[in-house]
Swiss-Prot record:
One of its GO terms (molecular function) is mRNA m(6)A methyltransferase activity. Residues 37-51, 423-441 have a biased composition (Basic and acidic residues). The gene is mettl14. The keyword Phosphoprotein does not apply. GO terms for biological process: forebrain radial glial cell differentiation; gliogenesis; mRNA destabilization; mRNA modification; mRNA processing; mRNA splicing, via spliceosome; RNA methylation; spermatogenesis. The METTL3-METTL14 heterodimer forms a N6-methyltransferase complex that methylates adenosine residues at the N(6) position of some mRNAs and regulates the circadian clock, differentiation of embryonic stem cells and cortical neurogenesis. In the heterodimer formed with mettl3, mettl14 constitutes the RNA-binding scaffold that recognizes the substrate rather than the catalytic core. N6-methyladenosine (m6A), which takes place at the 5'-[AG]GAC-3' consensus sites of some mRNAs, plays a role in mRNA stability and processing. Transmembrane segments: none annotated. It is found in: Nucleus. This is N(6)-adenosine-methyltransferase non-catalytic subunit METTL14. InterPro entries: METTL14-like, MT-A70-like, SAM-dependent_MTases_sf. Residues 21-96, 392-455 are annotated as: Disordered. Heterodimer; heterodimerizes with mettl3 to form an antiparallel heterodimer that constitutes an active methyltransferase. Component of the WMM complex, a N6-methyltransferase complex composed of a catalytic subcomplex, named MAC, and of an associated subcomplex, named MACOM. The MAC subcomplex is composed of mettl3 and mettl14.
Length: 455
């Protein structure tokens, strides 16, 4: 109880500090001097209305007086204006508000609280709106969902038990033929060094940039399995369209867009180098996900487990010059696809990971051996990590398809052009050859009976 009370007090203290900064007060204790109460605001409005009313009434009265006494109306009106205007300025002067910040124009101006106007809060404080998303990290994301948290724990244990030893190969994809890996991969993660990353960070790159024409020339279609997935980091600019073109060229269909949202809680107000091709500062990146072959979540539970994670990654923005992607992308891929043949292109020493083959030009060493790597998948279906009964029970699944009886149907009903066209027996009779129609129980034309029988 004491810890909970202490937490509430700390939040209240932080809230008062933010309000003091927002309202331009010297300290959190002086917020009351800056804010006006509702009674004071009402009194100010009444005084203003009185001043305006007295000014509006005084001028016509002076004009009528001039006309009654026969004096020159223009001279008297000018004299009255000179008498009234200084008085109006003196009366209304003390009540003119000086806007020190944008607090008056925020949502809910009657209380002068910032409420949830996160865009204006960013302008005033430098805190990005995504800083206030709750439970964004891996540790506390499923804190209120014990079933999902248990599922994640069980899947992590299974993945760590079935992962292959980490392997890595120092090679430049520009000159290295990927077909020499002699393996068809279930998952391929591509992290090309785009020029966009270095333009935003304002640093000089140690490796050459890759344009989208070079990325499209990669032989991804030659090293991907019949049913497989590719994850392509494409930045936040022109790569969103050009990345889709790459997926189509490699034989993949775009099925998802994983968005990395960058927060600045530790360094609010920090401004990045503005990209000359952008109007605003970009605070997110995209990872396009492509699918090859036929994979259905309802029938291919041995290969994919859908809806285990979300399609958002919310982490703190890396330091200036750091272009590494969040490690959470590996968790998303491993939780989703049960294939164990995983390839990471353009990897670095910091991204070497169990269960993955890392290939990149900046790696400092190599331990990849084709024969050793192939032995991990020599048995039938050994490329799959498998699934336990508990994981199968906890994971989200598609609802089972309803049977004909549950949908309220018995025998197939007639339709247009189907085997039972029309309605009931008449539709089935119509499908017989040489059918001429029955009317009133008597067949065709002529004969002893014509037309309908008498009633």
């Amino acid at each position: 109880m004491n810890s909970r009370l202490q937490e509430i007090r700390e939040r209240q203290k932080l809230r008062r500090q933010l309000l003091a900064q927002q309202l331009g007060a010297e300290s959190p204790d002086s917020i009351g001097a800056v804010l006006n109460s509702k009674d004071e605001q009402k009194e100010i409005e009444e005084t203003r209305e009185t001043c305006r009313a007295s000014f509006d009434i005084s001028v016509p009265g002076a004009k009528r007086k001039c006309l009654n006494e026969g004096e020159d109306p223009e001279e008297d009106v000018e004299e009255q204006k000179e008498d009234v205007e200084p008085q109006h300025q003196e009366e209304s002067g003390p009540y003119e508000e000086v806007y020190k910040d944008s607090s008056t124009f925020l949502k809910g101006t009657q209380s002068l609280n910032p409420h949830n106007d996160y865009c204006q809060h960013f302008v005033d404080t430098g805190h990005r709106p995504q800083n206030f998303i709750r439970d964004g990290g891996l540790a506390d994301r499923f804190e209120e969902y014990p079933k999902q948290r248990e599922l994640i724990r069980l899947k992590d244990e299974l993945i760590s038990a079935t992962n292959t030893p980490p392997m890595y190969l120092q090679a430049d994809p520009d000159t290295f033929d990927l077909r020499e890996l002699k393996c068809k991969f279930d998952v391929i993660l591509i992290e090309p060094p785009l020029e966009e990353y270095y333009r935003e960070s304002g640093i000089i790159a140690n490796e050459r940039f890759w344009n989208w024409d070079d990325i499209m020339k990669l032989n991804i279609e030659e090293i991907s399995s019949i049913r497989s997935f590719v994850f392509l980091w494409c930045g936040s600019g022109e790569g969103l369209d050009l990345g889709r073109m790459c997926l189509r060229k490699w034989g993949f269909r775009r099925c998802e867009d994983i968005c990395w949202i960058k927060t600045n809680k530790n360094n609010p107000g920090k401004t990045k180098t503005l990209d000359p091709k952008a109007v605003f500062q970009r605070t997110k990146e995209h990872c396009l996900m492509g699918i090859k072959g036929t994979v259905r979540r309802s029938t291919d539970g041995d290969f994919i487990h859908a809806n285990v994670d979300i399609d958002l990654i919310i982490t703190e923005e890396p330091e200036m010059g750091n272009i590494e992607k969040p490690v959470e992308i590996f968790h998303i891929i491993e939780h989703f696809c049960l294939g164990r043949r995983r390839l990471h292109l353009f990897g670095r020493d910091s991204t070497i990971r169990p269960g993955w083959l890392t290939v990149g030009p900046t790696l400092t060493n190599s331990n990849f051996n084709i024969e050793v790597y192939s032995t991990h998948f020599s048995e039938p279906n050994s490329y799959l990590s498998g699934c336990t009964e508990e994981i199968e029970r906890l994971r989200p699944k598609s609802p089972p398809p309803k049977s004909m009886a549950e949908r309220g149907g018995g025998a197939p009903r007639g339709g247009r052009g189907g085997p039972a066209a029309g309605r009931g027996d008449r539709g089935r009779e119509r499908n017989r050859p040489n059918f001429r129609g029955d009317r009133g129980g008597f067949r065709g034309r002529g004969g002893p009976h014509r037309g309908f029988p008498p009633r």
